[in-house]
Regions:
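Rossmann-like dinucleotide/flavin-binding elements
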Residues: 2-23, 62-74, 90-92, 108-165
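Conserved N-terminal/central alpha/beta ligand/cofactor-binding core
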Residues: 33-34, 50-81, 99
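Flavin (primarily FAD) binding-site architecture
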Residues: 85-100, 104-105
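Rossmann-like dinucleotide-binding cores of NAD(P)H-dependent redox enzymes
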Residues: 22, 26-57, 61, 114, ...
Length: 182
């Protein structure tokens, strides 16, 4: 995989003189840095420059390539070792009553779709359940996609939110509303 750990491992191996190849299922390298972190937080030019540094070191990156049989791939490629960097791109599951009653999507999928150019259809009012940094990103992106109201709903108090205060403040500056436990 060409996400953070795969790219980091490739760099460490390449600077030590090893020949390195990366295979990734996505269209472009970067993993969650490209598909989970909004561009306003991590400009794609910065990420692309880091990937270009790896290529300059001789790292071969092949995208749009899913590995179905790791052992066969290792044998066919005559690799001495394989580092499996499959990523951590899953959202936390929460039990929300009537979750199947309306259009609901997890924040990671929403952010990945936006980053991939697949603009999701959103309504004028968007509710985000949770108050972590990913929730703040999703709320801000919803506003940028045209939502009139983007509301963070959190089951605890503001003091208990896992997001960094500056992330909350940035979201509020963009018009995101916060609904805390009272």
């Amino acid at each position: 995989g060409a996400g953070p750990s795969g790219l980091s491992a490739a760099y460490q191996l390449a600077v030590r003189g090893h020949e390195v190849e990366i295979r990734d299922a996505m269209a472009e390298p970067g993993g969650m840095m490209r598909y989970g972190i909004p561009e306003y937080r991590l400009p794609r030019a910065v990420l692309d420059a880091e990937v270009a540094r790896l290529v300059e070191l001789g790292v071969v990156i092949t995208c749009n390539t899913k590995i179905d049989d790791l052992l066969a791939e290792q044998a066919e490629g005559d690799f001495d070792a394989v580092f499996v960097a499959i990523g951590a791109h899953l959202s936390k599951r929460v039990d929300i009553p009537n979750m199947d009653a309306g259009h609901m999507v997890d924040a990671v999928t929403f952010l990945r779709d936006v980053a991939s150019g697949n603009r999701p259809e959103i309504g004028k009012r968007v509710a985000i359940y949770g108050a972590g940094n990913t929730a703040m990103d999703a709320a801000r992106v919803a506003r940028r996609l045209g939502a009139d109201d983007s509301i963070i709903i959190y089951r605890r108090t503001q003091e208990q939110m896992p997001a960094h205060v500056e992330e909350m403040e940035g979201a509020e500056r963009e018009g995101v509303k916060m609904n805390w436990l009272r």
